[in-house]
């Protein structure tokens, strides 16, 4: 996620740019590991590992910056496409297993496909609106922070509402 053109960066930054690149690589490896672990744990526990609202927000972010506003190096584009593909796996486990988690709320349970579609469309619209307001490169970074905050809060809410750690593990946390 480059929110600025580093070709115009001061020479002092260019000398240590490898640190930022290494951090981006580690972040990509972390997300890849987390997505793969989440898919595995979700299939094993027959539930989903990421709360629905953050999942839809994150999926919309991946869709927005892999398909609608792809930019950066080939490595950046590949990372976004790969993240989107893994996120499809996370989304699959959620769609497949969500009904089991919503037996206490029949209205939600009956409307889960509609809820997924509306949430993804709404979050995609939000990401696009932010990109139009401040530009895609800045919006990519800022909306990622928002997604991460929503993901953290959603994980805690999911843990509290389930009353157990089904779908989660120390590895994923």
From Swiss-Prot:
Top-level enzyme category: lyase
Designated name of the protein: Terpene cyclase subB
Pfam families: Pyr4-TMTC (PF25129)
UniProt topology in membrane: Multi-pass membrane protein
Highest taxon, organism lineage: Eukaryota
Induction note: The subglutinol cluster is highly expressed when mycelia and hyphae are transferred to fresh media for a 3 hour induction period, remaining expressed under conditions of heat shock. The cluster is repressed in cultures reaching stationary phase or in early germinating cultures, as well as under conditions of UV, salt and oxidative stress.
GO terms, molecular function: lyase activity
InterPro entries: PaxB-like
GO BP annotations listed: terpenoid biosynthetic process
Main localization, broad class: membrane
Coiled-coil region: none
Keyword Translocase: no
Source organism of the structure: Metarhizium robertsii (strain ARSEF 23 / ATCC MYA-3075)
Pathway info: Secondary metabolite biosynthesis; terpenoid biosynthesis
Keywords: Lyase, Membrane, Transmembrane, Transmembrane helix
EC number: 4.2.3.-
Gene it is expressed from: subB
Keyword DNA-binding: no
Family as reported in the entry's similarity comment: Belongs to the paxB family.
